[in-house]
Structure formats: C-alpha cells, structure tokens
Amino acid sequence: MPLAETQMATVLSNADPQGKGRVRVRMNWQTDGMQTGWVRVMTPDGGSSSDVKSNRGFVFIPEVGDQVLLGFRHGDPARPYVMGSLFNGVTGSGGLAANHRKSLTTRSGSTVTFDDTAHTILLQTTRANKIFIDELNGTITISSAEEVNVNTKNININASENMNVNVGKNFTMQVGGDANMTVDGNARLSVGGDVDSTIIKNVNTVISGDESHTIKGKFNMDVDQNIDVCSKSKISTLSEAESNISSKANMYIKSAVRVDIAKG
C-alpha cells in the first residue's frame, strides 16, 4: 500500500449528515466533481467528560471554501483527517507590525482581538456590542447597541473611590424588601419637576443638627388626626402679612406663667 503524505485541499461541505463536525474536501490534484468522504477535523482539545457528552473542547469546523491541510492516519490514503486551515494571499493579513495582534473571528464577523502593543482585549459583535479591556489604563468598558441585562441571585458592587450613574431618560428602581442607604458625607437631591412620595405606614426622622426649609410658593399641610408640636426651647412664628387662626371647635391657649397678646 502506498504511503500518503500531507495534502492541500479545499473544503466543499461541512454539513455532516451525522452531526459529528466532519467536512468533505477536494484535494488539489482532484478534478471537478471529485471529493473525499467525510473527514474528521483535528482540534487542540476534543472529546467528552462525565458532565459533557459531546463537543467538550475546541469546536472550530472549517468553513466551505477554506484551504486545509490533510494528514493521513498511518499514511493510509483511505484515512485522511484535517490537520488545520491555512490562510492564503487573499484571506490572510497577519498580525500586523511586530506581530502584535492575535484574533479569533467568526464567519459573521464577531471577533476576539488581543493587542500586545496596546495591552488590550476586545470582544465585539457586528452590531457594536463589545467588551473592551484596557490593561494600561486599568479600564473595562461594556457597550451595547440596545440593552445590558444582568440576571443573578446576588450582586455586589464595590468602588474604592467614585461611582457615577448617568441616565438619559427614566430611572426606575424596585425593591421587594427593605432599602438601606448610608452616606458618611453630605447628600444632595436636585429635582427639576415635582416630587411625589407615598408612604403606607410611619415616617421617623432623627436630625442631630438643624433643619431648614425654604419654600418660594405655598405650603399646605393636611392631617387627618392630631398635630403635636413640642419644643424644649422657644417657638417663634413670624408672618409678614395677615395671620389667621381658626377652629371649628374649642380653642385653648395655656401657659405655665402668663399669656401676652400685644400689638407692635
């Protein structure tokens, strides 16, 4: 039996009828209409495991039209296998200057690119969805053409310095249980429109320092039950216009010392 040596070939089909990742090729010396049977493809790692029954390892099947290199098991011409694919003068552009770029690109154009000069890693689809890791600047950037969804049980975000959230339109936050926020420094809230608050139960506020309210419009307070105001010091009420106090029931003014009503 003659010994077969490595051969150049072109992939004619990768639609393996048994779904085993094999390809059909035509070797360079074969004429039109000639082709091999279904040929297995070499991979850096392939097999199965106790958890994965098939496709454990690298699954990269050559595309139709790719140039490949055939080897032959024990040199048997009837037992070829694909050793790998080869770029040619049309399909290959190399790793650019100083061979600094390594990449993996799928048929549709999704890529993973490693740049050893810029020290970056880019994972990108054809629709501008990308993950960009910049080692020199210490940044990771995630970009999406539409949405970014994170689904998990727990999420922890730890920032040793600043955290900024910028929302172009609406912002909605829903909490099924309790919500706790602790600010060690100052807290500021600026709202360009209205603020509506609905609280089903009680509100308790403890202020260790002073509290000031400045209202440039009207102030209305509607309480269904009692209002109690207690101060351990003086209470002052000043109006620059007319003041009215009215009650639909009895009114009592009581002082431990005396009550003075004066005009002045």
Language model segments and positions:
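Structural signature for extended repeat/solenoid scaffolds and their inter-repeat hinge/linker regions
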Residues: 4-230, 234-238, 243-245
